[in-house]
Design a protein with these regions (language model features):
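Internal alpha/beta loop-helix hairpins
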Residues: 1-40, 66
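Glycine/charge-rich catalytic "coupling/switch" loops of P-loop NTPases
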Residues: 7, 11-13, 40-87, 104-161
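Well-ordered beta-strand positions
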Residues: 23-26, 87, 99
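Short solvent-exposed strand/turn elements
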Residues: 34-42, 96-105
Length: 161
């Protein structure tokens, strides 16, 4: 049984924000791939040039946790990492901080899920990201994460005006 710490409101802890770079556009599937320091995210096609920077926001309510690699799911964005922290909020909610490497995102789960999955800091798990928001316009290319290689497959193309 979990010891329940004092209550806190979940509102100020619901979003993570970081910079990503447009890696490629897949016009056939209407998806854009974004690169950030700890992986890639696929989002609906955005009208930004390849290599441009964007600000990404991920709401904790859009992040689920899996203990094993999720294979047969419709969620496209699945990233490995580990639970860094659990913060008990107003019942029944718990904010799970998920460490992807250099990037941290949050998942808003219930206490029941924490108990059922036996979530504890340090536990390796998968973040399943259901939605990603792009905030504002394209950013300067200075200080953007640099992918190891730029892809050149047939689906890589600039967004058509």
């Amino acid at each position: 049984m979990l010891e329940i710490p004092p209550k806190r409101s979940p509102r100020p802890l619901l979003k993570a924000s970081f910079t990503a770079r447009v890696l490629r556009h897949d016009t056939d599937l209407a998806l854009t791939t974004l690169f950030f320091e700890d992986g890639e995210l696929r989002v609906p096609l955005i009208d930004f040039p390849i290599e441009s920077g964007v600000r990404v926001r991920i709401d904790a309510r859009d992040v689920s946790i899996a203990l094993s690699r999720p294979m047969d799911v419709s969620i496209t964005n699945r990233l490995p990492g580990q639970i860094a922290e659990l913060e008990f909020l107003t019942p029944p909610y718990v904010r799970a901080t998920f460490d992807l490497g250099k990037t941290r995102i949050h998942s808003l789960v219930t206490r029941e899920s924490v108990e059922r999955l036996a979530l504890v800091p340090g536990l390796k798990a998968w973040a399943m990201i259901k939605a990603v928001a792009i905030a504002g316009g394209a950013l300067s290319r200075d200080r953007l994460p640099e992918p190891r290689t730029w892809p050149s497959d047939r689906r890589t193309s600039p967004v058509k005006p």
